[in-house]
C-alpha cells in the first residue's frame, strides 16, 4: 500500500509531512522530537521522559492539563511517549479541530518555558517516581526494559542507561538544568510534524506556517556519544533476576543491524519467523508441541544508530522450571542456526509483516506516526512507501546469512527472571549453582 505524501520544510527547520485521506472525518497530528534517553548525559538522566510529562503542564497561553481538556472536549484523543532515540506527542481529532491540535503543539514548542516553574518541576518529578514504582518496580518483569539494554550495551554507550532515568538524577536536577535541556532539543529544527487524515492541503500548510513559522530554530544540539559497536557480543552474556513473579521468563537479545539498513530487513523477517503470531517457530515448538512455554514472541528495538537488538521473549508454563525454559529456548535457537530457514517460512513472515503495515497505514494516527518515524530516524517520511518492497526483496539466503552471523552463542545476552523465594540463599544463586552443576 502506498500513501500520498507531501513534505516541506519551514525556514526554522521544521520538517512537515502531509498525507491526505478523506475516508473518515478525522485528522491526526503527530510531532516527533529527535531526542530520547540516548541524548542524556550521565548525572542528568531521565530528562527526555520527564518532558513527556512537563509538556502537558501548560505553556504561556495554556493552563496546566488544559491541553488534555481542550482536545478531549473537542472529541479527540492524545498522548505522548518516550524512547531511546525520540520523544513524540500526538492527537487525533475531528477534522474541523485541526487548527486546535496544531496551535496546542506549536504553543508548547514555542512558549513552554515562560510557564515552567519550580513547583511544576517538583510535582512532575514526584509523578515520574510514582510511575516508576507502579510500572517498573512493582510490575511483574517490569524491570526488563531497563536491565536488558544494560546487559546488551556497554556502560559507556548512550543506549545503556534506563529510559525512565535515575531517580537520584531527577531529584538533583535544577530548574535551569531542565530548562536548558528543553532549549537544546525541543526546537523546530529538531522536530518532525506529520498530519494525516481528512484535511485540505493548502489549509494545513497555512496553519502550520502561521503557528510554527515564528518559532526560532535552536542553537544546535551536542553530538551523541560513541555509538559504534562490534557486530557481536563476543560471548554469551547472562543475568538472573529474582523477582516477584509467578513464572520464569527469558529475554534473549542478539546484536542486530540498525533500523533501515539493508541487513535490518533480514533481521526483522527472522524475528517474525521466530516469534510473530502463533504460527511462528517458537510458539509452535515451545507452546504447542513441547508445552514448556505459555507464550513466545520476538521483536526488534528498531534503533537507528550503532546497533539494534533482536529480542526473544518466552514465558514458562507453571510446571516448567527456569532451567528447563532456558535450555528449551537455546535448543530452538541452535536448531535455527544449524538448519536455517526455508523460503516458505520467509514468505509467510513477509506476508504477516506486510499485512500489519497495510493495516497500520489505514489508521490516521498510525500513518502520521510512521511518517514521523522515517523522517526522524532516516531523514525522509516517503520511505514509508518502500517498506513493503524492502521486505519483499528478502530471501531465505538473506535470513540464513543473518542467522549464521548473529544468532550464534557468541552473540546472546540472556536475562532470566525467576520467582522470588525465601531463605538465606536467593533463588537466583540456587539456579546459578544448579545450572553450573
Regions found by a protein language model. Give the residues of each.
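Non-catalytic beta-strand/loop surface segments
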Residues: 1-37, 61-97, 119, 135-190, ...
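Short pre-active-site segment immediately N-terminal to the catalytic Zn-binding motif
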Residues: 36-44
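Short, polar/flexible loop-turn hinges at active-site or ligand-entry regions and domain interfaces
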Residues: 39, 57-61, 110-119
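Catalytic glutamate of the conserved HExxH
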Residues: 50, 54
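A common structural junction motif
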Residues: 106-116, 211-219, 330-341
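Carbohydrate-associated surface elements
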Residues: 198
Amino acid at each position: 500500500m502506498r500513501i500520498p505524501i507531501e513534505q516541506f520544510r519551514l525556514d526554522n527547520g521544521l520538517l512537515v509531512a502531509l498525507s491526505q485521506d478523506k475516508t473518515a472525518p478525522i485528522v491526526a497530528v503527530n510531532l516527533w522530537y529527535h531526542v530520547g534517553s540516548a541524548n542524556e548525559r550521565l548525572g542528568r538522566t531521565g530528562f527526555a521522559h520527564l518532558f513527556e510529562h512537563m509538556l502537558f503542564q501548560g505553556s504561556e497561553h495554556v493552563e496546566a492539563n488544559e491541553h488534555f481538556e481542550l482536545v478531549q472536549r473537542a472529541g479527540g484523543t492524545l498522548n505522548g511517549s518516550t524512547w531511546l532515540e525520540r520523544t513524540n506527542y500526538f492527537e487525533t481529532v475531528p477534522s474541523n479541530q485541526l487548527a486546535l491540535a496544531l496551535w496546542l503543539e506549536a504553543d508548547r514548542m514555542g512558549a513552554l518555558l515562560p510557564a515552567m516553574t519550580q513547583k511544576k518541576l517538583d510535582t512532575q518529578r514526584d509523578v515520574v517516581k510514582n510511575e516508576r514504582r507502579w510500572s517498573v518496580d512493582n510490575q511483574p518483569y517490569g524491570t526488563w526494559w531497563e536491565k536488558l539494554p544494560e546487559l546488551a550495551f556497554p556502560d559507556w554507550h548512550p543506549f545503556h542507561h534506563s529510559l525512565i532515568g535515575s531517580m537520584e538524577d531527577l531529584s538533583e536536577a535544577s530548574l535551569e538544568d531542565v530548562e536548558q535541556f528543553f532549549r537544546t532539543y525541543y526546537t523546530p529544527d529538531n522536530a518532525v510534524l506529520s498530519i494525516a487524515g481528512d484535511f485540505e492541503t493548502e489549509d494545513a500548510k497555512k496553519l502550520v506556517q502561521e503557528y510554527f513559522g515564528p518559532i526560532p530554530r535552536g542553537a544546535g544540539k551536542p553530538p551523541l556519544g560513541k555509538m559504534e559497536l562490534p557486530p557481536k557480543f563476543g560471548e554469551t552474556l547472562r543475568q538472573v533476576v529474582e523477582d516477584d513473579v509467578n513464572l520464569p521468563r527469558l529475554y534473549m537479545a542478539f546484536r542486530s543491524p540498525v533500523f533501515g539498513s539493508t541487513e535490518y530487513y533480514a533481521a526483522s523477517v527472522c524475528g517474525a519467523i521466530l516469534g510473530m503470531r502463533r504460527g511462528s517457530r517458537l510458539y509452535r515448538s515451545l507452546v504447542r508441541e513441547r508445552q514448556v512455554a505459555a507464550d513466545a514472541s520476538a521483536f526488534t528495538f528498531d534503533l537507528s544508530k550503532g546497533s539494534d537488538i533482536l529480542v526473544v521473549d518466552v514465558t514458562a508454563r507453571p510446571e516448567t522450571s527456569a532451567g528447563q525454559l532456558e535450555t528449551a529456548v537455546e535448543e530452538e535457537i541452535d536448531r535455527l542456526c544449524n538448519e536455517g530457514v526455508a523460503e516458505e517460512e520467509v514468505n509467510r513472515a513477509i506476508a504477516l509483516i506486510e499485512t500489519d503495515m497495510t493495516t497500520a497505514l489505514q489508521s490516521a494516527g498510525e500513518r502520521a506516526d510512521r511518517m514521523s518515524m522515517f523522517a526522524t530516524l532516516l531523514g525522509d517520511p516517503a520511505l514509508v512507501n518502500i517498506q513493503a518492497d524492502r521486505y519483499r526483496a528478502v530471501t531465505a539466503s538473506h535470513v540464513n546469512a543473518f542467522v549464521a552471523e548473529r544468532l550464534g552463542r557468541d552473540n546472546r545476552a540472556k536475562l532470566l527472571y525467576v520467582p522470588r523465594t525465601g531463605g538465606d540463599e536467593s533463588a537466583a544463586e540456587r539456579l546459578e549453582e544448579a545450572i553450573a552443576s
